[in-house]
Amino acid sequence: MPQKYSDETEQFLKDGYVFVPSLLVPEEVQILVDAAHADDKMLGSAFELADTGGARIRLSGWNHAGDDTFGLIARLPRVVDRIEAFLGGEVYHYHSKMIMKDARVGGAWAWHQD
């Protein structure tokens, strides 16, 4: 395990998650926000589902990290290297999804991953 990620990896193995507040700088987050509002392909492929209470949520999903803003962020060494340290080997970006809703409006997404 790379020494620089050992504390984060220990937390991941203990808790099942790790929060890295400095992973993206504010300018990178803003680029993602802008891309989410301007990406016609992502917006065009969005669909609605009902949550467990019947309220509607809108989401978009894709299976490969492309050459767009989201794909480039997913391939950043500071992202990939951490995940490889957490999981103990090479990783493959299999699937992405984005919940496309305003805060406090519409349904809720119950995250579940096995």
Each predicted region: which residue ranges?
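Non-heme Fe(II)-dependent double-stranded beta-helix
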Residues: M1-D15, V20-Q113
